[in-house]
C-alpha cells in the first residue's frame, strides 16, 4: 500500500500501546507518559509547551499537577472505551455507539487513543471485523472533526474527517509492517518455545485481522476503492531481492482481502484489473516453490470468484450473531428448542407446551450468564447422583397443571432416570414396562439426531454437560493457539439422544423416592398443529388478473394507497414481482403521459414500501424491452415511452444511470439509452444531468453500436440527439487544433483556453489528454507534412529533430501551466503521447525522444514516468510496445533516482 492510503496525513502511533483482547485478558491502556509518539510529539494545541527556566517552582509544581490530572482523566476515558468495546454486540450496537461518542472525545489525542483501541480489538477478533467496521462508520460520521472544514472532494466520495484520516493512517502502518512480527519468529534457527509459538500465532491473527478489517471498511466505503487496489497490487507484485517461497505471508493476506472485499471490487469497470490479478494468482498457484497450504489458499480464492463469490457453507455464517439467531441455530443444527423469556403479564398457571418459562423461578438459583442468552435450560436440577434436590417444576408441569411441590397442589413427579441409577436402574425401569412409553417417538427422534450429528462440528459431539459457568460470549483468544493449551472458557454442549432419557410417568414406582437428574434434556414432544384451512397460493394467471385490476383501478382513480394495499393483499411470491411490474408498465404504455407518470410513481412507491426492489424493476424493464418488436406494431413510440419510465426511475433513485447502462452496452436496443438521457435533460436540466452522468463513469462509446464506437462518430450522434453538452471536451479537441494552426504562439493558446474552457476542466485528465494530443499532432504535421511520403521506420533528419525540439520548447510554458505539481495529469500526458505514437505506427525513436525532451525540459517529473510504467490500465492501446521502446531508459531513470536518494541520505 502506498502513501495514498493515508489521505489525511502520516501520523503514526505504536500498536503496542493499545490492546483489546478477549474478556479476562490483562488490561493495557494507552500510555501517556513516556510515549513520545503517542503524546509528546503530537503537534497542535495539546502539545506540551516550553516553559522558561526562570519560572518559579510553584509554577512547575502546578504544571506537573495539571499534567498528572490530565493523564489520569485520559486513562479513565480509555478504560471506559475498553469496557464499551468488550460489551459490543449486534444487539447493543446503537446503545454502545452513543456511549462511546459521549465518553469525552474532546481532542485529537483522545480520538487517536479510541482509534488505537478499536483497531487492536478488530485485529485480535477477526470474526467481529464487520461489527467494528460498522462502529468506525458511525464514528466517522458522528465523532468530532478537529481538522476544520475540508476541501470539496470528488462527487460521491466520503468527506475526509479527523477520525477517517487517523484510522487510515493507523491501518497503513499495520499494513506496511504486516509481516514484521511474524518474521521475527520465522527467522529463528532453533525450535520455538510454546510461549513463542503462541506469540507467533497471535501476531499472525493480527496480520490477517488487519487485512480483513481493511476489507470490511472498504465494503462500507470508508476506504476508497483505489486504495484497496493498491493493497492488492502490493501483496501480489514480485518484490526485489525476495524469493517466491518467501511471499507466503503476503499471498495469505491477498486471499484474505479477496475473500472479504472481492465481490465489491469485481465490477465491470475493474474487470480487466481483476482478470490480471487472478491470472497472476493462477500462475502462482501452479508454482512448486510455494508451500502447499498457500497454493490451496490461492486455489480456493480463484474458485470462489469462478462461483460468483458465493462462499462454501463453512464460510457462510462466520460473523457476529444476535441472541435470536443463536437460538434459531440451536433449533436448526442441534434439534434443541431453547425458549425465549416470556413477556410480562401472561398467566404462568395456564401455560401450555413442553417447557416452563424461565421467569417462573419458584425460588430457584439462576443459571448465571447463560440464562440471559438462552433462557432457563429445561430439565436442570441441583446436585448429581441419587438424592438430588428436585426442581420446583418439571418440564411437563405446564401440560398437567399440577406438581406436588407447586403451591401445595397434588400432582405427579418424574421417576428416577436411567443415567442416575446406572444399569440396575435401567433394568428396573424395563421390568416395570415403562420404557415402552413414547418408544416410537424416541426412535424417530434418535435417528433424526444421529443424522444431524454427522454434520455437527466436533466440539458439539464431545462428552460433557452444559455448564453455565463455562460459557463465554466471545470466541477463544486464538484458533491457532498452542493445541496443548485448552482455553478455560471453551463452551461445551452435549446432546443426549432421546433413547437415553427416561419416559414420562404420572406416578413413581413403589418404594422409590422421586428424583430428577442433573442436566438431562427432556425428549422433544411434537404437538400436532391445529388443522387450518389455508387457501392455496394464487396461480400466475390469477395474479396477472389481480394486477391488471389493481393497476386499472389506480390509473382511473389515482388513489396510490389503495393500489399499494391491493398489491399487498395479492400475496405475490418474490419471483413474480418482475412480471407484475412489467404488467404495470405495459398497461400504461398506450395511455396518456399523465397515466405513465402515475405508473412510474406506483413503482417507486412499491420500492419505498419494501414490496419491490431495484433489481425487480430492472428485470421488468428488460422483460418489456424483449417484447418491443410485438409492442411496436400497436405502439410505434414504445421505446420513447420506456425511456420516460427509465428516466423517472433514475430521478426517484430507483436505479442509477450505470445500472441502466449495463444491459444496454454495445448498442443493445439502440438508441434507447440516448432517449433516456434526453428525457432526463427534459425532466430536470442539463447541469444536473451532466454532473450525474460524470459520476456514473459510464463509457459512452461502449453504449453505441460497435461500428460507431469512435470519438468522431460519437460526437456526430450526440450532436444529432442534442446531447453533446455531456462531452464538452469532444468539441474542444477539434477547435483547439484549429486554434493552434491559426496562431501557435503560447500566449494566444493560453488566452483562448481561459476564454473558452471552464476552469473546472483545467484539472481534468480528459482536457490534458486533448491538449497534449493537439500539440503532438501539430508538431508532427509541421515536422513531417502529410504530403511527404516518409517511412515511419526511417529515422528523421537532423533538421527535423531540431525543428521538433524547438516546437516542443515553444509549447513548454502552456504545458507546465497545466501539468506542474499534478503527477496524475502528467501520467495522462504520457498516455496521450503513447496513443499518438500508436496511431502513427510508432515512428522510429519518437517515443524515446519525447520522453527525454519531457524529462530534460522539466515538463514531466520522474515520479510520473515511473507511475506510467507501473500502471496496468488497458484503457489506452499500445502500452506493451511503448514499454519495450523506453524500458531501458526508464530503468536508468529509476536507478539514477535511487542513487540520488542514497547520496542525500548519506
Curated annotation (Swiss-Prot):
There is a cross-link at residue 574 (Glycyl lysine isopeptide (Lys-Gly) (interchain with G-Cter in SUMO2)). Residues 1-71, 497-540 are annotated as: Disordered. The modification Phosphothreonine is found at residues 89, 507, 513. CDD domains: W2_eIF4G1_like. Pfam families: MA3, MIF4G, W2. The modification N6-methyllysine is found at residue 430. Residues 542-665 form the MI domain. Phosphorylation; hyperphosphorylated during mitosis. One of its GO terms (molecular function) is translation factor activity, RNA binding. Ubiquitously expressed in all tissues examined. Residues 719-903 form the W2 domain. The modification Omega-N-methylarginine is found at residues 359, 504. GO terms for biological process: regulation of translational initiation. It comes from the Eukaryota. The keyword Ubl conjugation applies. The modification N-acetylmethionine is found at residue 1. The modification Phosphoserine is found at residues 11, 394, 442, 901. Residues 502-515 have a biased composition (Polar residues). Interacts with the serine/threonine protein kinases MKNK1 and MKNK2. Binds EIF4A and EIF3. Interacts with MIF4GD. Interacts with DAZAP2. This gene has been shown to be extensively edited in the liver of APOBEC1 transgenic animals. Its aberrant editing could contribute to the potent oncogenesis induced by overexpression of APOBEC1. The aberrant edited sequence, called NAT1, is likely to be a fundamental translational repressor. Appears to play a role in the switch from cap-dependent to IRES-mediated translation during mitosis, apoptosis and viral infection. Cleaved by some caspases and viral proteases. Belongs to the eukaryotic initiation factor 4G family. This is Eukaryotic translation initiation factor 4 gamma 2. It comes from Mus musculus (Mouse). The gene is Eif4g2.
